[in-house]
């Protein structure tokens, strides 16, 4: 009996440690990452990627909203999924819906031209040493760095590695 309780507690402790340091499961809510990700998909998120390395342009990430919480006690931060577009120190500008980094247009083959008719401009903004510019793939329906500003490195939870469910072609590869 005591052995079973200890085994259960050890398994629970291991699960908590893994979730806090290595891997997390997240669920997509909303249309901001369509067509890459869809509402209801379950994602495998690697926390380890950013413990061992730095975010790269094009990474699909889970982030915390700065200053937003899901509970009144401010214990659970609100999270969202976006794509890393701008890296620390870079200058980002949007002209007629096209993202420019350091004056050069960014190639974004993952965007759906029929869905993304967002043609507004955003004046150039240089990111700080610890800031990332994130956007949703569905620019017409995304609350992202255009609105909330750059995301500090500490707010990046991890990199989305795989869609766990539903099964099908993996939209994050290739």
Regions found by a protein language model. Name each.
Residues 142-147:
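Active-site loop architecture of trypsin-fold serine endopeptidases
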Residues 79-105:
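Mid-length scaffold segments of soluble, non-membrane domains
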Residues 102-119:
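PP2C/PPM family metal-dependent serine/threonine protein phosphatase catalytic domain
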Residues 1-79, 151-174:
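Protein maturation boundaries and topogenic segments
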């Amino acid at each position: 009996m005591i052995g079973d309780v200890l085994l259960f507690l050890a398994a629970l402790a291991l699960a908590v440690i893994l979730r806090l340091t290595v891997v997390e499961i997240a669920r997509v809510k909303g249309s901001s990452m369509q067509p890459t990700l869809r509402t209801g998909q379950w994602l495998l998120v690697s926390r380890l990627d950013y413990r061992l390395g730095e975010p790269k342009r094009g990474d699909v990430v889970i982030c915390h909203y700065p200053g937003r919480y899901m509970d009144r006690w401010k214990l659970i931060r609100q999270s969202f999924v976006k794509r890393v577009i701008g890296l620390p120190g870079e200058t980002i500008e949007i002209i007629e819906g096209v993202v420019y980094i350091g004056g050069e247009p960014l190639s974004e083959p993952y965007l759906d031209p029929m869905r993304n008719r967002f043609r507004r401009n955003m004046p150039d903004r240089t990111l700080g040493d610890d800031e990332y510019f994130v956007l949703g793939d569905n620019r017409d329906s995304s609350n992202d760095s255009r609105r909330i500003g750059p995301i500090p490195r500490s707010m990046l939870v991890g990199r989305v590695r795989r869609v766990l469910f539903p099964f099908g072609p993996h939209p994050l590869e290739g």
